[in-house]
């Protein structure tokens, strides 16, 4: 592992430690581009009662605000723990090109800090997942077409 990776992973771990000391969950994340830290985040679920307030999500939001764009192409994310499926999806949608994490799901499992079961559930077809997921078509096909027209007017 390079010194750069080590430095940013240690920063994510320090954020997690500081967050834990303040009563939060032990997760921190750092968004980096070109060797520069764009943003950091910690898990704020307990403080905000927001189940999406994961460290990676907070860091992605802050980086996007700083750049004035949701496009985080060329960025790397360093996380203290194995990113959950929600965070992985957000990083992919934002264009993050690289993710490194310090602690695995296996290391977190004995402490209730693993999302391996969620990954396993999501790997199943919708009909076999633990959540009831249904496609319920509605008679309003114009919604997406209207959005596309609005985007074309902006261009």
Predicted regions and their residues:
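Zinc-dependent deaminase
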Residues: 1-19, 83, 90-155
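Helix-adjacent hinge/juxtasegments
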Residues: 57-90, 94
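Residues that line or immediately flank small-molecule/substrate-binding pockets and catalytic motifs
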Residues: 45, 79, 103
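Small-residue (primarily alanine) positions within well-ordered alpha-helices
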Residues: 12, 16-19, 29, 55, ...
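Short, basic and Ser/Thr-rich N-terminal targeting/leader segments
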Residues: 23-27, 73
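A short, polar/charged loop-to-alpha-helix boundary motif
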Residues: 44-57
